[in-house]
Structure formats: C-alpha cells, structure tokens
Design a protein with these regions (language model features):
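Membrane-inserting effector segments that mediate pore formation, membrane fusion
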Residues: 62-111
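Alpha-helical rod/repeat scaffolding segments in eukaryotic adaptors/tethers
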Residues: 26-30, 34, 53, 57-60, ...
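Acidic, serine/threonine- and proline-rich low-complexity regulatory regions
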Residues: 76-82, 102-105, 130-141, 199
C-alpha cells in the first residue's frame, strides 16, 4: 500500500522546488523560464520554422501540437484548483529551452519532437472531465501527478542539454531519454484510464501504487546505466 499522497497544492510546490534545485540552470535562465508564456513558445517555434525554411531543413513541428493542445486544456482546468500563476511556465519554458538549444542538430531536435508527440498522444484531454474535478479529490490528485510526470521528463532533458558536451553525451544517454519518454507516456495513459473511470478511493490507491512502482523501477534502471557508462569511461582511460 502506498503512503497517503500529498495534498495537490503541496505536490506542485515540491515538484517545482525539485526542478529549480536539480535542473542546473543559472538564476538568469530560471528567471527566463519562469516567465515564459505559451505565446513566447509559439513565437520561438515560428522563428525556428522560418529559419528551417531558409536552410531547407523543415522538421515538421506539428509533432508538438498534441502535447501543446493537451497542456492548454490542462492549464484551463488547473487554474480552478491551484493558485500558481506561473505553473505552466514550467511546461512552456522547458519546451522552449530544449527546442531552441537543439534546433541546429537535426537528429536530437527530431528525437525531442517525437518524444513530445508520444507524450501528447497519451495525455488525457481534461476539459471533458472538468465537472468531476471539483467534487473528486482523487481526480485533483491525479492532475498533480500529470504535472509531476511532465516535469520529471523536462528535468532529465534539461539536465542533459544544459551540459556543454551534450552533443557528445546525447548518443550515450539517448536510450535513457527514450525510456523516460515511454515511462511518462505509459503513466499518462494510466491517468487517462483512471479519469475515464471517475476515480474511487480504491482505484486511486491502486493507480498511485502502480505509478510509484514504475518510477522506482525507472530510477533503478537509470542508476544501472550510469554505473555502466562510468565503468566504460574508466576502461577507456
């Protein structure tokens, strides 16, 4: 049996605090991220698209659209329950940072777009459930879990692409990033099924236990991969 989950507002606060502490961003970068709006992201995407047209390297940015659509609906619903004006900046900001950073490396840029498409296609479209959130605390807690899942993906990706040597590291860490995408997509698929059932206490406990187990399993795999990479470096030296 999993422990009692935190109240939704507390879950958001802890997720944001963890991201700020572990992302490896400078204070200036964090300030920019925390003030990023969807409009800012869309302007950056338009600039990237224009540049790609000029260089004849158009890379189908519409792959990002399912994710953006789902997160827009998320924003509409979550504003009813959480008094955090900059919450979605921690979605739009990392997307902008990651795509701007990798826009000149086609393989990496495409991998990120594919990842966002996979995540976006599994996200529940929340407006159809909005009448249930107000009266169902377990649905509200599931909303917080969705944000945590997306932010965990962004944390791992930002940690990688913030490093100066990310172009060299990408191939060594690509499979780990793909696994994280799949992990988040699977979790969001469970969120969607959970919301369709309109969430009883027993269902929430089962859902939360499964989510905790999968997160622990993924963390163990990450640790094993780091050990393997470290040993390979030592052998090379």
């Amino acid at each position: 049996m999993s422990q009692n989950p935190l109240p939704p507002s507390r879950s958001y606060d802890l997720a944001l605090r963890n991201f700020r502490l572990q992302a490896g961003l400078t204070p200036q970068e964090l300030d920019e991220l925390e003030t990023t709006t969807l409009e800012d992201l869309q302007k950056a995407l338009a600039t990237m698209q224009t540049k790609q047209q000029h260089t004849k390297k158009l890379m189908y940015l519409k792959r990002l659209q399912p994710f953006l659509d789902a997160m827009e609906q998320y924003s509409t619903v979550i504003n009813i329950f959480v008094n955090t004006s900059n919450l979605l900046a921690f979605v739009w900001g990392p997307v902008k940072f990651l795509l701007v950073t990798t826009s000149n490396v086609s393989e990496v840029f495409n991998a990120l777009l594919d990842g966002y498409r996979s995540i976006g296609e599994q996200m529940p479209l929340l407006l159809q459930y909005r009448d249930f959130f107000d009266s169902n605390q377990y649905m509200q807690k599931a909303l917080a879990s969705i944000f945590e899942d997306v932010l965990e993906f962004h944390l791992q990706a930002v940690q990688l692409f913030k490093q100066r040597s990310w172009k060299q590291l990408f191939h060594a860490t690509k499979q780990s990033l793909i696994r994280k995408v799949n992990d988040v997509a699977d979790s969001l698929k469970r969120h969607r099924a959970f919301m369709q059932s309109q969430a009883s206490l027993i269902q929430y406990q089962e859902f939360d236990e499964t989510r905790t187990y999968m997160k622990e399993k993924f963390a163990k795999l990450q640790h094993q991969e780091r050990d393997i990479r470290y040993r390979r470096v030592q052998e090379w030296l």
